[in-house]
Amino acid sequence: MTVSNNKELLLEVNHLGVSFKIKNDKSLFFAKPQTLKAVKDVSFKLYAGETLGVVGESGCGKSTLARAIIGLVEASEGEILWLGKHLRKQSAKQWKETRKDIQMIFQDPLASLNPRMNIGEIIAEPLKIYQPHLSAAEVKEKVQAMMLKVGLLPNLINRYPHEFSGGQCQRIGIARALIIEPKMIICDEPVSALDVSIQAQVVNLLKSLQKEMGLSLIFIAHDLAVVKHISDRVLVMYLGNAMELGSDVEVYNDTKHPYTKALMSAVPIPDPKLERNKSIELLEGDLPSPINPPSGCVFRTRCLKADENCAKQKPPFTSQNNSHFVACLKVL
């Protein structure tokens, strides 16, 4: 996959696949376990200081993709290269060093925090792992400085997670991820569990911290309006497959794939006149089973443009300009 960019290439994902074995019903004692392919043949690149938005319906493989990149689930095929090094070939000791540069912010802010630890201990935990030489006073100083940076008062350092709102808990999670100054943050739907008014605050905080610290972000969400606000490039996924990938301008203003068009039509427009006159593309049917996906194009069972060729051939993920990639026979 070719994308012209003068910035440093941090992450390269090539033909990544993640599969899980699914146990059959207990009555079928001799039946072989089925295979669920959560991520199939996904490729993209991430450059220094860039934000890649990953969007799609629930169950499309967004979070599994993120967890495979950081090593929380094992990839079954493909390559994950971090600064040119193959992550899948790394030992546990090498992974520990890599995770200094790659941190993650989780979807449920309260569930991701240890209820038995105060927030000072939570934020300081990465420092104790990666910088054990620091004194208690130095750790406290760094923690309080990071709390200020994410919008938390330092005098709250001894309080516990249950004493904070959802938005504040997410700020604690952000502080914990940033305390060791990583190069990349994977944000797994960081605002989906928050009120709309708080979502904008957290997204703007991430943008501000990205600019200040030179971070690269993988921002996973199902809200295309939020993704547009923060992303430089956008990857659209469906049933574990990459459907479309391009810059935010290309994906939002020159949408190619029928699935992306359907997602875009569901995004509300603040202008009442435009909202009243816009066309809505409704998807037919339900999301197919990932254990038994459709042949050919996985989206064909819900696509209004699908024909018999779509059932016979899986569309290649290709581009005409080396930046805007689409997996659709009707676009090629």
Curated annotation (Swiss-Prot):
The UniProt entry, under NCBIfam families, shows: oligo_HPY, PRK15079.1
Where the record annotates domain ABC transporter, the positions are 23-264
- Quote the EC number: 7.4.2.6
Q: Which UniProt keywords apply?
A: ATP-binding, Cell inner membrane, Cell membrane, Membrane, Nucleotide-binding, Peptide transport, Protein transport, Translocase, Transport
Which family does the similarity line name? Belongs to the ABC transporter superfamily.
Q: Which InterPro entries match?
A: AAA+_ATPase, ABC_transp_ATP-bind, ABC_transporter-like_ATP-bd, ABC_transporter-like_CS, Oligopep_ABC_C, P-loop_NTPase
Species: Haemophilus influenzae (strain ATCC 51907 / DSM 11121 / KW20 / Rd)
Single GO term (MF): ATP hydrolysis activity
Assembly, per entry: The complex is composed of two ATP-binding proteins (OppD and OppF), two transmembrane proteins (OppB and OppC) and a solute-binding protein (OppA).
Q: In its UniProt entry, what is this protein called?
A: Oligopeptide transport ATP-binding protein OppF
**Pfam families (alphabetical):** ABC_tran, oligo_HPY
